[in-house]
Amino acid sequence: MFLAQEIIRKKRDGHALSDEEIRFFINGIRDNTISEGQIAALAMTIFFHDMTMPERVSLTMAMRDSGTVLDWKSLNLNGPIVDKHSTGGVGDVTSLMLGPMVAACGGYVPMISGRGLGHTGGTLDKLEAIPGFDIFPDDNRFREIIQDVGVAIIGQTSSLAPADKRFYATRDITATVDSIPLITGSILAKKLAEGLDALVMDVKVGSGAFMPTYELSEALAEAIVGVANGAGVRTTALLTDMNQVLASSAGNAVEVREAVQFLTGEYRNPRLFDVTMALCVEMLISGQLAKDDAEARAKLQAVLDNGKAAEVFGRMVAAQKGPSDFVENYDKYLPTAMLSKAVYADTEGFISAMDTRALGMAVVSMGGGRRQASDTIDYSVGFTDMARLGDSIDGQRPLAVIHAKDETSWQEAAKAVKAAIILDDKAPASTPSVYRRITE
């Protein structure tokens, strides 16, 4: 038997906590036998004293084990259970293509996703732009969809990592969110509860990233890879660029439209293609569905070219109560904004920088995201035809097409877009889509 205050004191004095002490504390968070003040105190001591790798692994596994851990063995699936997690960005619609692509290659992807947070778009919000799409199927239905289709994208239920929910709520109001061991534990507790064989992390870098600097993004990626592998799940991470909107669109319905066009081959943004393929390659190799990069890319290109990936996406939408002909008739089903028109720069030049975070917040301000949990989303608003870094901008080339609910909203968004995109008389040096691969 442990005392919460003694565990806090031990960490306060700079000592490492044992696995048993960490489990006692996390179970107390779940059971409400640990007070909010005690949670806040431990969070602050971890913020200042950090955690050793064994402590980080123990924290993550204790939070994972505070609720249901999915077990797929009874289904006798003939492929690996794999998933991807992104730290979030703007125009980051990779999940909608990646899940079906990997499933079409023989993987099983039980993706538990989130809503938009701050300036970043949420996969669940995007999917809810599809009429009827059910993000909360019951456990049996979730398992059936994984078995039959190979991929399902759902919301987090209260039974998965419940201790994390209470821990995070306290961190949010005590200035302890930005602690790498606590971020790592929070992300991985939910992902590892999916019962995965392998995981790939997409850690964003740049003006639209969760972490403010490249060095902190790198440190987070290394921590996640170390902890997840320590917890027994094969994990790699990619550091990917978020110095500009990843897709050609940002919003909800507009990104779903682009995802379908990507899968069918109607239109593929080159940077979005690079990042999506790179993440899928990691999933196939970690899941032992391909022996190397070349084999993985060939398999993935094949399922795009022969229509299997698009077919899997369509089957997933239908299985989750969306329209059965969604892929064929997406324009019929997706909402469109009342006003769609281009915004042009006031001067000419090359795009040298982009405040991606500000562009994400502009989508939120138009109604495409939530400022508080009770807000309703306007799924139709957002940006399309986004200009890229290095593009030559003049009176013919707009910065973006803005989809807004009315003229006032359009004007506010246009002002935000102009302020967020910097022009110069010289084109900037090109930056990679993927900066680094982390395996340990």
Swiss-Prot record:
Catalytic activity: thymidine + phosphate = 2-deoxy-alpha-D-ribose 1-phosphate + thymine
Enzyme class: transferase
EC id: 2.4.2.4
Any Pfam family: PYNP_C
One CC-aspect GO term: cytosol
GO biological processes: pyrimidine nucleobase metabolic process; thymidine metabolic process
Entries under InterPro entries matching the protein: Glycosyl_Trfase_fam3, Glycosyl_Trfase_fam3_N_dom, Glycosyl_Trfase_fam3_N_dom_sf, Nuc_phospho_transferase, PYNP-like_C_sf, PYNP_C, Pyrmidine_PPas_bac/euk, Pyrmidine_PPase_CS
Keywords: Glycosyltransferase, Transferase
Keyword Cell inner membrane: no
Recorded metabolic or biological pathway in which this protein acts: Pyrimidine metabolism; dTMP biosynthesis via salvage pathway; dTMP from thymine: step 1/2
GO MF annotations, alphabetized: 1,4-alpha-oligoglucan phosphorylase activity; thymidine phosphorylase activity
PROSITE patterns listed in its UniProt record: THYMID_PHOSPHORYLASE (PS00647)
Biological role stated in the UniProt entry: The enzymes which catalyze the reversible phosphorolysis of pyrimidine nucleosides are involved in the degradation of these compounds and in their utilization as carbon and energy sources, or in the rescue of pyrimidine bases for nucleotide synthesis.
Family: Belongs to the thymidine/pyrimidine-nucleoside phosphorylase family.
Subunit record text: Homodimer.
Family annotation (NCBIfam families): PRK05820.1 (NF004490), T_phosphoryl (TIGR02643), Y_phosphoryl (TIGR02644)
PANTHER family xref list: THYMIDINE PHOSPHORYLASE
Protein name in UniProt: Thymidine phosphorylase
